[in-house]
C-alpha cells in the first residue's frame, strides 16, 4: 500500500493522487498514451528504456506556467496548445503522449473547476444548493447534507476514447464528488439508449472526435462547435471522421443514438476543457494539491458514489445499474496494496534474484472502461505512484489493441511493462499465439513481465500450468481473482508462483456434483482467501430445501464459531442467525456462493439486507480504516448486505480457500441428478488427455474422430417457453482453431469432408461416461465467438445463434406456420407404439389414411411446440403419445395456432380438443375421428333452460349457497380420478356466478379490478402497444362498473373453491375469471386520460357507424372486458404441484365457458345479439367457435398512422376484430 495513505483521514481516492504531488515522484511520468498501438513498433534498445529513438514521437503535454501574472490569458492559451497537440495529431505509428503525476493532478483541478462552473449555471434545475460564496460561512461539522438532491442520483455520462483526457475527467469527477458513468462505443447503440433513459444523467460529456463523427452528416460546417471555432484550427479534421465507418464506430443504429442524445444535455469535452476560469476561482487553485471545498459539488458526502456501471448479469436481459462507493473501491485497492500480502506488487526498484537489471512497476491499462476491472487496473497503479501505459484512442479501442499478441509484445518490450490484467479466454488466446513463436523471442521481449492478474471467469488448472511452462522466470506470478461488478470487482484472490502451486491448489469435483462415480471429475482451481471486511458463505440450493434451517443447526446460536461450516472472512457485525434466510452447508459441500459485508453494493439487483446483532464481532481483520466502520455504523448499523452472484462453489476444509465450480444458470437437474454444462467441456479435456497418454493407440474409431475437436463450449439451451430442455455443445475442429475469434457470426461446417465426427460418434464416446438423458447435442462451428469488450465467450450470442439456426424463433411463434410438407410421405416411427407402418395396411385402406393423418397432425404439434433436432428439422415421433401438450410449453395462444394449422390440413377441429385433455395421444386420437369437412354453422343460442348437476360436497358451498350458480368446472381430468396416488381426496372446482344480479356475492369489487388489471398488464398486447399502465386500466374498469348502477348489463365471475380434509385446511376460494358486458347503447366513453382517449378512438375506428348503419344498438349487449388469471389458484397446494401446467388447459376451458354462459343469460334476458371487440387471437378464436361473425377487422398500424403516432415493430400485427353473435331471445 502506498505510504502516503497512512496519513489519510478518509479514503477519498483523489486525495491519494494529491498526496503524490507532494512526494519525490511528482515529476515522474504517470501515463504513456499510445493512440495507435496496432501499428506500434518497438525499435529501441532493450537496455535503454529512457533513450529516445528517431522512430518514436514523444509528446509531453504542456502544463500551464506557474508564472501566471504575465498574461491573464496565458493559462487559457496553454490549455489551447495542449488541446491542439492532441486533437490535430496525425497519430503516427509510434506517437506517444506522456503526463507526469503533478501535471495530471493540475489538469484534473482545472477540468473540475470548469465543470463545476458549467454545472453552476444549470444548478437550479439539479438541486437547491446554496451559493458557493456562502459555503465558507458554514461550519465543516455540519452533519446533514446541504443538497436536496441525493449525490447518488446526480450522475454524469462520459463518452470518450482511451487516453489522458479520459483519465483527467475521471479524477476531476472524484474531486467534485460527482459520480460518473462510462459509455463505450463498443456497446450497441440500443443498449446505450436503455442506459441513458434508465439513469438520466445531468450531462453527457463527449469527446470531440466522437461528436464530429456522430453529427458529421448533420452539419458539415461544424455549426454546433461554434464555441470552439475560435480556438481550434478548423482546417484540421479529426482522425476518426476519416478512418472510421458507421459500423466500425458503433454497433447498431447511429440515428437512434442521435435521437437519444437530443433528450439530454450534451457537451463536447474540449469545450469544458478550454472554458475560461470562473471569476469565483483563482488560477492559483489549479496548482494546489486539492481544489477548494467551495468548488466541490457535494462537499459533505462522506462516502460518495464514484462509479456507475451497468451489467446485464446472468438472470435478466435488461441493463442493471451498479453504483460503487468510495469505501468499496478503496477497500479493494487497499487489499491489493497491502505489503504484508502476496497480492502486493514487487517493490518499485526490486532487484530480481537472477538478473542484474532492476524492474520498475509499470502497468498496462487496456480493459474497456465499462468493466469494473478497468478501474482497478488503472487506479491501483496511478494512486500508488505506479505509471501506466494506456493503448488505444479515437480510432482504436484499447481492448482491440491487444487482440494480437504481437501488439502486446511490442508494448511490453518498449515500456518494460511489469504487470497486466486479463480474462481467462484472452490469456488462452495469447498462450496459443505465443507457443507459435520462438521461445527466445518470448523470453527476451517479455522479460520485464512479472505479474499476470486473471479475473472475470474460471481459470482452468491446465491453462495455469501451460502459463508457467511458457514463463519459467521464478519471479513470475499468476494471480487468480474472483468477484463481480456488484462487489467492486474482486473479493478473493490467490497468488501462484509456479506449477507446484497450481497442482497444490487444484481440487477434482465429481461431474454432475452428485454422481457417485468419482472417477470422472473436473479439476477446479482455488480463488484464494477473502478481502477484509467481507465474508463468504456457501448456502443450500433453494430448489431442494427452500433455504430453511435444519433443526440441528438451530441449536447452535453462533454459527460463525463453528469451524465445520462453510464460512470464511469477517464482517463488522454478526448476522442475526434467526433472520438469516439461508442454510449454511458444511465445508467441502458444493452450493451457492453468498457474499456479505461492506464490499456489496447496495444497488446490486440481487442484494438483500438482513438484520445484524448489536454487539461487534471479533474479526480476524484488524487493519481496517476507521472511516469505514463509522460509515457502516451511520448508514446501516442494524443491517448487513447479502449478495448472491449466481455462482456455485465450495470451501476447502484444510485451506479455507474458495473454489468456484460454475454458474447456477448453467446447472440442470434431470432425474434427480444435477449436472453442470461445463462438465462436458471438462470431460473433453480429460478424454483427450487420456488418449494422448496412450499415443492414440487402442482407440476406437469414434475416439479418433472426437480427438479432432479443439475447443468446446457447452450451454443449457432453453425453449421459447422458458424450460431447460437440453445441453448443447458447440465445438471447433483443429482445422479452424486459428481463425479470428472475435464476435462475428460463427458458421457451421457444412463441408462434406470424410472422417468428421457425427452426432452418433459423440454419443458412442460419451455414453461410457454420461447417462443417455444427459447426452448433449453437438454442433460444429468454425470458431468460438468472444465478446468485443471483455474477451469472454459470448454465451448469449451462441444461444441466440442456436435459436435462429436450430430452433423456433421467439418472434416466429406468433406467425401462422405454413405446412409446406403437406404432401410429404409419412415415415415409419419405430419408437412410437401408436404408429403403424405402411406395410401393415394397403395404401388405400382407411387405417393407412388415418395413420398418415395422425403423423401429419403430430408434425404440426412438433412445429408449434418448437421440438426440433440439431439440423433444424422436426424430430420424428415427437411429441410422443404419453407426453403432455401443456407440459411441453403449450398455452392458449399455441392452441389457436395449432388449431389453425390443423384446419389447413383438412381436420375438423376446434379448441374443445385441447380443453378436454392435454395428452398428445388423446389429442391425436380425437383428430383421427374427425371428418375432412368444414365446420358446421352453429345455430343461435336460445334461452332454453339448462341444469346444474348435483354437487357432491355441500361443504364447498358454505359461502356460495346464496350465489346465482350458473356452472361448475372440475379442476382435474377424468384420468386423474382413476389414480388415487396421483390425485388426493378433496374438492377442487370453479363456480361461475352472476355478480350483478342483485343476490349476495362473495366477490368484492376490488377483486374484479385486481384480476382484470393484472391480466391486462401481463398479457394484453394492445395495452403494451399503447403503454397503458395500472392507473389507466383501473380507471377504465371503474367506469364500466359504475355504468351498471343506471344501466345494468351482465358481469360474470368465476371463483375457485378448494377443501381437503387431509390437509386440515378451511375452504379456500379465489377469483380467477371475470367478464363485463353492458347494453351497447349505454357504453360510456373513455376520455379520462390521453391514453384511454386513444383507445376509445381506436375502437370507434373499428366500429365506424357510417359503415354499419343497419345495425341497431337498441337491443344489443356489448362485451367490454374479459380476463382469466394466468397464475394457477392451486399452485401453493403441496399435493398439486404436478397440476400447474393443467391450469393452461383449464383457463382455456373457463374462457369458453364464460363466453358461452354470457350468451345464454343474454338470450334469457331478451337481448337480440352480443357484440365484442377482440384484440386477442385466443378470444377471437373462442368467439368464432361460438358462432360470432366478423363485421370488420382493423389493423392497429393503420390506425396509428392516421394518428401520426409511432408504433413499435413488434406490435404492428395487432388487429381488432369487431364481431357480433345473433341470439334468439326468449319470449
From Swiss-Prot:
Q: Which organism is it from?
A: Schistosoma mansoni (Blood fluke)
> What catalytic activity is recorded?
tryptamine + beta-alanine + ATP = beta-alanyl-tryptamine + AMP + diphosphate + H(+); beta-alanine + ATP + H(+) = beta-alanyl-5'-AMP + diphosphate; beta-alanyl-5'-AMP + holo-[peptidyl-carrier protein] = beta-alanyl-[peptidyl-carrier protein] + AMP + H(+); beta-alanyl-[peptidyl-carrier protein] + tryptamine = beta-alanyl-tryptamine + holo-[peptidyl-carrier protein] + H(+)
Q: What is its EC number?
A: 6.3.2.-
Domains (record comment) = The nonribosomal peptide synthase is composed of three domains. The adenylation (A) domain is responsible for the adenylation and activation of beta-alanine using ATP. The thiolation (T) or peptidyl carrier protein domain (PCP) contains the prosthetic group 4'-phosphopantetheine; activated beta-alanyl-AMP is transferred to the prosthetic group via thiolation. The condensation (C) domain performs the selection of the amine substrate, tryptamine, and the condensation of this amine with beta-alanine via an amide bond.
Residues with the modification O-(pantetheine 4'-phosphoryl)serine, per the entry, are 892
Q: Which family does it belong to?
A: Belongs to the NRP synthetase family.
For region Condensation, the annotated ranges are: 932-1227
Cite the Carrier domain residue spans from the record.
Answer: 851-931
- Coiled-coil region: none
EC class of this enzyme?
A: ligase
Protein name, as recorded: Beta-alanyl-bioamine nonribosomal peptide synthetase
A GO biological-process term: female genitalia development
Gene name of the record:
NRPS
